[in-house]
Amino acid sequence: MLLGKDVDEVLERHLDIGGNLFKGIRHAGSWDSSNMINNSHHNPPKDMYLMKEFGEGLKILSGKGLVFEAWQYHHQLLQVAHLASNNPDLIIVLDHFSGPLGIGSYATIKEQVYKNWKKDLKELSQYKNVFAKLGGLAMPINGLGFEANPNPPT
């Protein structure tokens, strides 16, 4: 999406190759200033979802009827609300319920994290073009400690 308007050519190529099997893209924007918390695999810039080029790319994606999967941390939820507000025809899937962090500096303020997460999820829920994917809430970044158990939590 950071290609802005130039993403059209890339999406067209995907549509040509994938046909009706190509439904959309996931562009992970999870970013935190702490060196104890990993950013997304491609190390996105801070506030990537608010960048002009990203918004231009989403307009192209939306115009093609494709889906956008958003993966970011809890403190970035309102950036997704910004995307939803500016792209009412774009279907947005909120991956991993926006990863509430529970490690690093967040480990000692979990109650505040969950309070803010709940408030921001409620704000986001007003947008009928946003859907949430339930999963990924037992990752080590959530700080629940499931990774220390001998067996998975489910």
Regions found by a protein language model. Name each.
Residues M1, K23-S30, L66-F68:
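Divalent metal-dependent hydrolysis catalytic cores, especially in the metallo-beta-lactamase
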Residues M1-R13:
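A metal-dependent hydrolase metal-coordination microenvironment
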Residues N43-T154:
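Catalytic pocket-lining loop regions of alpha/beta-barrel enzymes
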